[in-house]
């Protein structure tokens, strides 16, 4: 099912305190590298000590403050599960479901003995199909699994009528995610492509196919996915909400794409035809190309694609040998990790992925005090006031557009900590007599049925959460005009209750400002106060915005992240605008909060310096070269170093705080500095 279009921060938040309630700087001196000059490389100055003292763990391709907090959250979740598995519970209770599912996730000995038995009946059924029509019937029978289907579907808010859900159809079918992996010809990408072919063949062998058959099937999968890549939009092109909104009727879909059995697949999934009479086709050109591809492919190709779907959806839940082969490619080859996480971590993450809200409810009771929620609400209000002031400060904007922007800001729907409505898991059955894989599929079926029941032909539920409470992240969703800060991010080290306002506004404050700014970035600005994809800008103001936004895209595209690789400033534009806006809004809020009682110097730094050091400290990390290449293709966020060294040179207050002057490496002349929000 389709996930809502949301804009996560990949950054963390915590609760605020009054400006004069703390007295520590919040800084850890050993995290700094005072041999570096802040005006030449602020990232190294602010995080160099941390990088040196925290070498990259073997199980990670990137490790920083964000991952440290995720580790802490994972340990808390694991403590809940370890406590649950010590007891026996009445069948059907949420405790029984969590406990038994966790035990299944931990029981690798059982999975090794079972081998591929849990998926063998499905593979045999596919193998027995004699014709393309037989295979297509199986696609309908197992429609929820999307066997060999190269596009995605699901319900979400109609972006031009956001009170109602609508059926969505969008491009898909690429194991590697980004089309660049199939089409780019630089040495690093070519090496990954060759490794991918070997990996696919190996996986087919591990699922019982002969070496010769595995090689043939792998080639069919690779050629098919390459053909899909050639007709797919790029990650950057997918960021244009207007271009990816194309409403059509089911009748029109059938006329346009006669070889795609969409209605039969939807019916097989449990969706009645009445709920797909109108839909949004995100990428019509892709669907047209896919229609031709699927018409031309023979039965053996479709069979290989369906088998590959089974392999891909089950590889994390079967034997150690299969898991290790999967890790060797995605972990080592793609990202540069040296080893996988231990069993307890993998098991904890798997339970969290399938029954996250059930765990989240327990998590919040144990680890999230109500006082934190109230304090966070206060800080969010402070940041809203500040963003309003920043809107008024944009001299290039007309009064008319500013008024509309204020209206949108005033209507932000703020979610903090945990949802008002918890998921009811009573219809989910976890059966310990069945395999781990079968129980995972039961969880997927439960979620699928729940989404259809709650969204097909139904109004949008604004109280739905798109992250679990224990998630270490935050997001903005334009169709509900909401900002969300789950309980998982409201903890140290991104907030220090004993530190003063400079530290906390520099860390948590920027996080909040970042999410708010997403409502006014290059994508978010296209949605109105109600969340509809509707233009509320004057033509002149829209031109002024785009002119400024283009300068950000160009600036970041000129950054070399590796000697042979530039950043993609157009792909990361929304996040770069949100980082800059978050800094501007939070710094302004910080100055508001301390206007009557300025903070003293602490640990050798002024209050303004501590604000920027706190922000930079959030992004201290170590990362492999392979992961850098991977993220440039797949991650709409700039790399940690450039969320610091790319953002700060455009903020006048940073120059003033650290005495940055002409001749310093990070200096940009004032008339060339970028400003938006």
Placement of each model-derived feature along the sequence:
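Short, solvent-exposed loop/turn and secondary-structure capping segments
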Residues: 29, 53-57, 153-156, 178-180, ...
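Active-site-surrounding "flap" and adjacent substrate/cofactor-binding loops of secreted or lumenal enzymes
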Residues: 37-40, 45-110
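Noncatalytic, helix-rich "gating/capping" subdomain that lines the substrate-entry/channel surface
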Residues: 84-378, 382
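Short, Gly/Pro- and small/polar-rich lid/capping loops
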Residues: 22-30
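Intrinsically disordered, low-complexity linker/terminal regions across diverse proteins
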Residues: 70, 256-259, 280-284, 341, ...
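Short secondary-structure subsegments characteristic of cysteine-rich extracellular domains
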Residues: 59-81, 214-231, 504-510, 608-612
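Bacterial Sec-dependent N-terminal signal peptides
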Residues: 1-22
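Hydrophobic/aromatic-rich, well-ordered segments within soluble, folded domains that form packed cores
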Residues: 31-52, 182, 186-205, 399, ...
């Amino acid at each position: 099912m389709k996930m809502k279009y949301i804009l996560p921060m990949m950054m963390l938040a915590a609760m605020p305190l009054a400006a004069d309630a703390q007295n520590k700087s919040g800084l850890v001196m050993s995290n700094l590298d005072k041999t570096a000059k802040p005006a030449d490389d602020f990232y190294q100055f602010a995080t160099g000590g941390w990088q040196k003292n925290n070498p990259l763990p073997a199980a990670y391709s990137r490790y920083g403050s964000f991952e440290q907090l995720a580790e802490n959250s994972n340990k808390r979740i694991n403590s809940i599960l370890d406590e649950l598995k010590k007891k026996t519970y009445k069948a059907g209770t949420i405790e029984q479901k969590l406990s038994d599912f966790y035990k299944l996730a931990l029981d690798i000995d059982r999975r090794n003995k079972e081998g591929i038995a849990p998926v063998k009946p499905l593979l045999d059924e596919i193998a027995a199909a004699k014709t393309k029509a037989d295979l297509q019937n199986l696609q309908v029978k197992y429609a929820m699994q999307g066997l060999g289907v190269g596009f995605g579907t699901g319900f979400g808010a109609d972006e031009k009528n956001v009170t109602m859900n609508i059926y969505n159809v969008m491009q898909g079918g690429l194991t590697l995610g980004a089309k660049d992996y199939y089409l780019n010809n630089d040495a690093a990408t070519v090496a990954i492509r060759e490794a991918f072919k070997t990996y696919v063949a190996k996986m087919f062998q591990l699922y019982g196919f002969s070496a010769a058959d595995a090689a043939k099937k792998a080639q069919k999968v690779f050629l098919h996915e390459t053909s899909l890549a050639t007709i797919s939009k790029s990650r950057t092109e997918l960021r244009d909400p207007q271009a990816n909104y194309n409403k059509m009727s089911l009748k029109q879909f059938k006329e346009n794409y006669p070889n795609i059995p969409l209605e039969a697949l939807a019916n097989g999934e449990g969706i009645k035809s009445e709920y797909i009479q109108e839909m949004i086709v995100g990428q019509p050109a892709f669907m047209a190309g896919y229609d031709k591809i699927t018409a031309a492919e023979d039965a053996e190709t479709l069979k290989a694609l369906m088998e590959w779907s089974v392999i891909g959806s089950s590889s994390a839940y079967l034997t150690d040998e299969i898991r290790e082969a999967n890790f060797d490619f995605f972990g080592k080859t793609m990202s540069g990790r040296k080893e996988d996480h231990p069993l307890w971590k993998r098991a904890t993450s798997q339970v969290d992925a399938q029954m996250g809200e059930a765990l989240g409810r327990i998590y919040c009771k144990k680890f999230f005090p109500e006082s934190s929620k109230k304090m966070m609400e206060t800080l969010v209000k402070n940041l809203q006031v500040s963003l309003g002031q920043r809107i008024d400060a944009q001299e290039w904007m007309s009064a008319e557009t500013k008024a509309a922007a204020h209206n949108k800001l005033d209507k932000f729907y703020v979610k903090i900590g945990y949802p008002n409505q918890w998921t009811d898991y009573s219809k989910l059955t976890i059966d310990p007599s069945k395999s781990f894989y079968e129980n995972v599929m039961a969880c997927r079926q439960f979620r699928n049925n729940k989404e259809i029941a709650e969204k097909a032909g139904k109004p949008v539920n604004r109280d739905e959460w798109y992250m679990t409470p224990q998630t270490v992240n935050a997001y903005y969703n334009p169709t509900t005009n909401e900002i969300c800060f789950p309980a998982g991010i409201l903890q140290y080290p991104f907030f220090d209750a004993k530190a003063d306002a400079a530290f906390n506004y520099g860390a948590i404050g920027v996080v909040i400002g970042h999410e708010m700014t997403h409502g006014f970035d290059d994508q978010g600005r296209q949605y109105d106060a109600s969340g509809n994809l509707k233009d509320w800008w004057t033509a002149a103001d829209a031109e002024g915005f785009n002119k400024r936004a283009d300068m950000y895209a160009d600036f970041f595209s000129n950054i070399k992240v590796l000697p042979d690789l530039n950043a993609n400033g157009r792909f990361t534009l929304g996040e770069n605008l949100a980082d800059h806006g978050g800094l501007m809004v939070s710094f302004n809020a910080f100055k508001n909060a301390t206007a009557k009682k300025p903070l003293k110097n602490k640990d050798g730094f002024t209050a303004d310096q501590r604000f920027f050091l706190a922000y930079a400290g959030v992004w201290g990390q170590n990362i492999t070269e392979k992961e850098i290449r991977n993220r440039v293709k797949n991650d709409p966020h700039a790399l940690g170093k450039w969320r610091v060294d790319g953002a700060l040179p455009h903020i006048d207050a940073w120059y003033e705080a650290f005495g940055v002057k002409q001749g310093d490496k990070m200096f940009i002349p004032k008339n060339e500095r970028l400003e938006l929000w």
